[in-house]
Amino acid sequence: MTDGNLSTSMNGVALMGILDGRPGDSLQELQHLSIKAVPRSLSVPDYGPTLKLGALEDRHSLQSVDSGIPTLEIGNPEPVPCSVVHVKRKQSESEIIPERAFQSACPLPSCTPSAPTGSEREQAVRKSSTFPRTGYDSVKLYSPTSKALSRSDDVSVCSVSSLGTELSTTLSVSNEDILDLMVTSNSSAIVTLENDDDPQFTDVTLSSIKETSDLHQQDCVAETEEGRKLRLLQPFSHFFTRNLLARKQNARLDRQRDLGWKLFGKVPLRETAQKDSKKTQKEYEDKAGRPSRPPSPKQNVRKNLDFEPLSTTALILEDRPANLPAKPAEEAQKHRQQYEEMVVQAKKRELKEAQRRKKQLEERCKVEESIGNAVLTWNNEILPNWETMWCSKKVRDLWWQGIPPSVRGKVWSLAIGNELNITHELFDICLARAKERWRSLSTGGSEVENEDAGFSAADREASLELIKLDISRTFPNLCIFQQGGPYHDMLHSILGAYTCYRPDVGYVQGMSFIAAVLILNLDTADAFIAFSNLLNKPCQMAFFRVDHGLMLTYFAAFEVFFEENLPKLFAHFKKNNLTADIYLIDWIFTLYSKSLPLDLACRIWDVFCRDGEEFLFRTALGILKLFEDILTRMDFIHSAQFLTRLPEDLPADDVFAAISTVQMQSRNKKWAQVLSALQKDSREMEEGSPSVRD
C-alpha cells in the first residue's frame, strides 16, 4: 500500500506503536483506537520529553532511533485485552525512549491492564514459536474483539528501519484471531489492517503493566517547552516534509543518549568510544609484550647508529601453529640460534652501510661548506684584485680545488682574456651575417658549391650546413642543446657567428662541445668572446686548422713526458703500436668535455684556463696513470676502446690526485722547452729535406 492511496473512503489506515518487552511482564488492556491517518510524506512526528527510567534494567541491550514516523490522530479508544506470553531477552534502561512515545492530537488515557489467565499463558507458550533460535522476543497478542477476523482479513506487514539500526517487525493474522508478533527491537511498527468494517488498532509495548501506564501518564504531564511548541505547530505539520523537524529531534536524541551496542558479549560501544586511544594502545602493547611507541615523533629520530636492523623487522621467530605438531626442543633451539645469527649479520651489514652513508654525507657537507667559503673569497678578495692576486700561491691552491660554479664564468673570462679585442657589437655583426648566410643557403644553396675553389672564405662559410648536424650530437644526455631545447639557438648563434668571424677556420667537429660548456657558464656574447679567444690559442689553432705537422709535434712532446712518467705503460703501448693520436685527438678537440663527466670536465677547464695547453697533456698523463694497471693487461683493440670511452663515474678527486703526481719536466726541461725544441727540429728537417734530395 502506498501513501497516496490513503483517503477517507479507504479501509487501510496506519498504526504506529512502540514495542518493548521485559521478562515476566504482561500487557493487559491497550486501547483499541479508531484513527485518522495523515499522509506520511506530509506528517511531522511529535516527540515527548525525556523521562527518567529505573536502574534495574540492563544497560547493554540493543537500541534504535526512529525518525520520519507519520503522526496519527486517535479517536475514542476501545479496550482491547492483550497479554505478553513469552519474552526471551532483557531490556535496558535506555531502551524505553519517551521521545518515541505515541503522539497524537489528544493525549492517551491511562488504562488499567488486567493480568492474563493461566490458560492463556499456556496456550501462548505452546504456540509462540515464531523465532525459537534467537534471543529476541517471541510475543503472542490476543485480540478477542466482537468481530472475528476471517482468512480474508489480511495484514500488511511493514519492515521498519530506524536511523541507527536495522530492525524489523513481522505480524501475521490467522482465522483463529491469534496475532503472532515477532519483535527484534523496541522499534516502532506500522501495521495496516484491510477489513470491510471499521479498522481496529492496538498499540503494544513490551514492558511491564505498571511502567506502561506510567509512561503514558508521564508523557502527558511532564512535557517540556520544546514539546509544547511542537504541539502548537501540529495543525500546520502537513505543510512541511516529515524530515524537516525529525532530523533535529533525532540529532538531539543522539546527543542526549550516547547509545552503545552489545555485540557478541563485548563491551558496549559507548564505553569503548570514551576510552583514551593512547591508553588502549598501551594496554594492547603490554598484553602483546611489545614496547610502546614514544608519544612524540621526535623521539623516533635516531641520534646514533645503534639501531635495530630494518631488514629483520619482518623476520619474526614464531612457533608452529596450534594445529601442527610442536617443534622438538633441539630443533627449536637450532632455529633460534640461526635466527639470532641472521639478525647479527643484518645488523653488521646495515651498520656498515649506515657508516658509509654517514661518511658520504659528511664529505658532501664539507664540500658544500668549502664551496660557500670559496665563493666569499673569490668575490671579496680575488676578483676585486685580480691583476695582483691571480698568480699568488693562495689563489693557485684555491684554483686547484675548483672554482665555484657561481663565479666560474667570470674567472674563465678573466683567465682566457680578450687578445682579439672582440666586442658585443662585433658579435652582433657576425651573427647577422651568419643569419643572412643561412637564408641564402635555404633559397639557393648551390651557389657556394659552384664558386671557385680558390675562395677559401666562401668554402669555410659553407660549413654552416655542418653546424646543424653537429649540434644534435652535443651533450645528448642533457637534451638542452638539441632542436627545441633552451640553448639550441644560443649554440647555433655562437657557432654560426664564429664561422663568419674566422672563415679561414670555419666549423670543425668538436667545436660545439667547447661552445656548449661556455654557454652553460656565460652569456651569449661573453661566451662568443671567450670561445674565439680560446680557439686562437696555438694548440687549439693547430688542431682545428688540422695542421698535421704541428699536431705531430704536440704528439711527440706528449710521448716524451709519457715515457718519463709511465715507462712501463709506454713500452706496452709501443709493443701494441698504440700511438697517441688514437686517443689524444678526441680529448684535445673537445677539451675533455665529451670524454669525461661534465662536472669533472669543468674542473679541468678551471686549471686549463690558468696553466694553458700544458695542463691538457698533463691531464692525459694523469688518466693513463690512473688506469695503468688496467691498460697494461689489455691488447691494442681493448686499450683503444677503453681510452676513447672512459668510465662515466670517474671521481674528480681520484683524477686530480693522479694528475698531481705527473711531473711535467724531462731532463730538466719543461713542457714549453721540449715543445719548442721539437718544433725547431721539425722545421730544420723540412728545410733540409730538399738539399738532402739534391
UniProtKB/Swiss-Prot annotation:
The places in or outside the cell where this protein is found are: Golgi apparatus, cis-Golgi network; Golgi apparatus, trans-Golgi network
The entry's cellular-component GO terms read: autophagosome; cytosol; Golgi apparatus; recycling endosome
Which GO terms of type biological process are on file?
negative regulation of autophagy; recycling endosome to Golgi transport; regulation of autophagosome assembly
Question: Any idea which UniProt keywords this protein has?
Answer: Golgi apparatus, GTPase activation, Phosphoprotein
Q: Is Acyltransferase tagged as a keyword?
A: no
Tissue distribution is:
PubMed:15758561 detected expression at the stage of sexual maturation in testis, mainly in the spermatocytes. No expression detected in the ovary, brain, heart, lung, liver and kidney. PubMed:15200410 detected expression in brain, heart, lung, liver, spleen and kidney but not in small intestine.
The superkingdom of the source organism is: Eukaryota
The record's section on SUPFAM superfamilies has: Ypt/Rab-GAP domain of gyp1p
**Database matches in SMART domains:** TBC (SM00164)
Give the modified residues of type Phosphoserine.
92, 296
How is this protein induced?
Up-regulated in nephrectomized kidney.
GO MF term (any one): GTPase activator activity
Q: What InterPro entries does UniProt report for this protein, alphabetically?
A: Rab-GAP-TBC_dom, Rab-GAP_TBC_sf, Rab_GAP_TBC_domain
> Where does the Rab-GAP TBC domain start and stop, copy by copy?
402-612
Instruction: Tell me the segments the record calls region Disordered.
Output: 108-130, 272-305
Cite the record's Basic and acidic residues compositional bias ranges.
272-289
- State the protein's purpose: Plays a role in the regulation of starvation-induced autophagosome formation. Together with the TRAPPIII complex, regulates a constitutive trafficking step from peripheral recycling endosomes to the early Golgi, maintaining the cycling pool of ATG9 required for initiation of autophagy.
Quaternary structure and partners: Interacts with ULK1. May interact with RAB11A and RAB11B, but does not exhibit any GTPase-activating activity toward these proteins. Interacts with TRAPPC8.
Protein name in UniProt: TBC1 domain family member 14
Q: What is the lineage of its organism?
A: Eukaryota, Metazoa, Chordata, Craniata, Vertebrata
Q: What gene name is listed for this protein?
A: Tbc1d14
